[in-house]
Amino acid sequence: MKLIHVLAALPFIGILLGIPFANKVTPYVFGMPFILAYIVMWALLTSALMAIVYVLDKENKKEEAE
């Protein structure tokens, strides 16, 4: 499996499998319940990971060269 496929799958795995473990309210992160902070963190990480996938993907470089 290529690195870009693993990077693209990380947000899906993190959100899907991490929610049962992060399902807590008591620790507050920046004034938000932990579960909400966890989802916001993954939304930001997803954007960063997709940017990395875009940069690493060789197909995008072919389109820019044309």
Swiss-Prot record:
Alphabetically sorted, this entry's keywords are:
Cell membrane, Membrane, Transmembrane, Transmembrane helix
Task: Spell out the GO cellular component terms annotated for this protein, sorted alphabetically and separated by semicolons.
Answer: plasma membrane
Per the record's keyword annotation, is Cell membrane included, yes or no? Answer: yes
Protein name, per record: Uncharacterized membrane protein YhjC
> Where is this gene product found?
Cell membrane
Q: Does the keyword Membrane feature in the UniProt annotation?
A: yes
Q: Which organism is it from?
A: Bacillus subtilis (strain 168)
Tell me the superkingdom of the source: Bacteria
Signal peptide range: none
Where does it primarily localize?
membrane
Topology in the lipid bilayer is annotated as: Multi-pass membrane protein
Annotated membrane-spanning segments are 3-23, 34-54
What gene name does this entry carry? yhjC
> Which Pfam families does the annotation name?
DUF3311 (PF11755)
